[in-house]
Every structure is written in structure tokens, then in C-alpha cells.
Design a protein with these regions (language model features):
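Pre-P-loop entry segment of helicase/translocase ATPase cores
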Residues: 1-47
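Walker A (P-loop) phosphate-binding loop of P-loop NTPases
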Residues: 56
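Walker A/P-loop NTP-binding motif
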Residues: 60-74
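Conserved RecA-like ASCE P-loop NTPase motor core of nucleic-acid helicases/translocases
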Residues: 77-89
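Inter-Walker segment of RecA-like/P-loop motor cores
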Residues: 88-146, 245
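Walker B catalytic acidic pair
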Residues: 151-155
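ASCE P-loop NTPase helicase motor core
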Residues: 157-231
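ATPase catalytic-site recognition across NTP-hydrolyzing enzymes
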Residues: 217-285
Length: 288
């Protein structure tokens, strides 16, 4: 065995990919270990599924669960998982996915070159999962895929994501269950919002967005949320704790303004004080 290929997880029959694990029982065990929003994502049958999640909410584990489920439902076909960049495939996806496969004793074979890919060995047969970077999304053009999973899609430039999305959907033309699943912490009004959050998107019947809060994950350190609350402003907390779509680039001061606390009708004696005036040169009306 070369360092570019390896086998993992309870290959009890050395040199063989045989497994007697009951696939339905395996998927039931995986689902039982998920918290409710993860289960909602796992159970979703829409063609396009989004997961908008706070930090530490468990979105990567949700994607790992979905990757195994879709692989089991598409025996003999090919799926793909995508991270924003190639290093993130190695640093995030491969580490977490292999731990997941080992935890559930799912036999697999990994090939690192020329591009990383996993083959999962089920009782009914094999299923392949390609690992690709979203920055090089065009590499999947020409493939017939059953499913595509994308992690941290809001980190990708909206120009690239918007161009790649319809092309990737065009690859979903094989297998028994064809799905596009994307998970990310929302970064303002980017791809997740445009695809799931607009009024037009909400009227579509082919897609659904699931929101997952940081506090939904019972496995986080007890002080994790408290530390975030102590260091993030309200807008960032709405996005990074609750998975909400908020403006993270403009209007940061305005959202904290309240007339009761910041406006007064009394005029203190300031005759001897220097006069300081602040002006906000807005796009439309100027405020002083």
C-alpha cells in the first residue's frame, strides 16, 4: 500500500472490502446521534437544501452525515464534496470525515492523488465521494454526479458561487437520490441569502433552508457562547450564533441607536465647552 492510498475503518477481512453492516441500521444510528436541526437537515428530501448555522453548531458533522446517507442511497454512483479552497479539504473535511467514518465503523478506501477521493464500502456495494475545491469548481464539469455537498459556501466570492451553482446543478443527473446540499455560517447577504432568503427564493418548491443555532449543539464547551457574547456585537451575534442574515458591513452604529437613550431635549450649560459636530455623509441623507 502506498502513502497515496489507504484503507480505513474495521476492514476485518484483511485485503477485502467486505462488510456485513446493515445499512438501514447504520443510518438510524447516525440520525439518532444528531441534534434536532441536524436531523431536519438529514431528513430533508428537497433537491436543494441549505443549512445556515452559527459557529460550532455542528454543520460539518451534518454534512458528514448527509455524505454517508447519500452515498448509501446512490450505490455505484459518484458524489462530490466541496470546500472553498483545496487546503480546507485537507484541514477540515478529511479530518472530520475520517473521524466520522471510523466512529461508525464504515469501511472506506482513500486515494490522495491525482485528486482526493473516498470510496465507501457498503453491504450493497461501493459509492465514491470526490473532494474538490469550490475555487476550481469547473473540474467537476463533465462528470455525472448523484449529489454535491458544499461547506462554507458563503466564504466563496458571490461572483464565483452564483456562476458555479447552476453549472453544478447540471451535473446532478445520475443516481437514485439527486441533491445539492450547502452549509455555511452566513456572511451577510451573499449566496445563502440569495438562494434561500429572498422573497422569490422562499416561493420556490425545490429548496429549503434550515437554520441551526450555536446553542443547538449540546457538545460545546460550557463557556463557548458566553465568550462569543462578550466579544461580538449584536449584528455579529445574530449571524454567528443564530445563523441569521444580517448586514455585517454597514449600519453597525445605526442598529444600536435608540431614541430613548440617545436623544435628549434638555440643554446643559455648555457655554464654556468646545463645540464638536459629527456628520455622517450617507449615500442619501446626511446626518449630524
Amino acid at each position: 500500500m502506498s502513502i497515496l492510498n489507504r484503507e480505513g475503518s474495521v476492514l476485518d477481512h484483511v485485503g477485502s472490502h467486505y462488510t456485513d453492516i446493515d445499512t438501514d441500521e447504520l443510518l438510524d444510528r447516525i440520525r439518532a446521534d444528531l441534534h434536532p436541526p441536524q436531523q431536519q437537515f438529514f431528513d430533508n428530501q428537497n433537491e436543494i437544501v441549505g443549512l445556515s448555522a452559527g459557529y460550532g453548531a455542528g454543520k460539518t458533522r451534518a454534512l458528514c452525515s448527509m455524505a454517508v446517507k447519500l452515498a448509501a442511497q446512490n450505490i455505484g454512483f459518484i458524489g462530490a464534496v466541496m470546500e472553498p479552497t483545496a487546503p480546507l479539504i485537507r484541514d477540515i473535511w478529511q479530518t472530520d470525515f475520517e473521524l466520522f467514518l471510523e466512529q461508525y465503523e464504515i469501511p472506506y478506501t482513500f486515494r490522495a492523488s491525482p485528486l482526493p477521493e473516498y470510496t465507501m464500502h457498503f453491504k450493497e456495494g461501493d459509492s465514491k465521494l470526490l473532494c474538490r475545491s469550490f475555487e476550481n469548481w469547473s473540474r467537476i464539469i463533465g462528470l455525472n454526479l448523484s449529489h454535491v455537498l458544499v461547506d462554507e459556501i458563503d466564504v466563496v466570492s458571490p461572483v464565483i458561487a452564483d456562476k458555479a451553482f447552476p453549472k453544478i446543478l447540471g451535473r446532478l443527473r445520475a443516481g437514485n437520490v439527486r441533491q445539492f446540499c450547502a452549509a455555511s455560517t452566513p456572511e451577510g447577504f451573499r449566496w445563502l441569502y440569495n438562494t434561500f432568503g429572498t422573497d422569490e427564493a422562499k416561493e420556490r418548491t425545490d429548496r429549503e433552508l434550515i437554520k441551526m443555532r450555536t446553542q443547538d449543539n449540546p457538545h460545546l464547551p460550557s463557556d463557548f457562547i458566553e465568550r462569543m457574547q462578550a466579544n461580538y456585537d449584536p449584528s455579529m451575534l445574530a449571524a454567528y450564533l443564530n445563523g441569521e442574515f444580517v448586514n455585517l458591513t454597514t449600519g453597525m452604529v445605526y442598529s444600536r441607536f435608540t431614541r430613548e437613550q440617545n436623544v435628549t431635549n434638555s440643554k446643559p450649560d455648555i457655554g464654556l465647552e468646545p463645540l464638536r459636530i459629527g456628520i455622517d455623509f450617507n449615500i442619501q441623507n446626511t446626518n449630524a
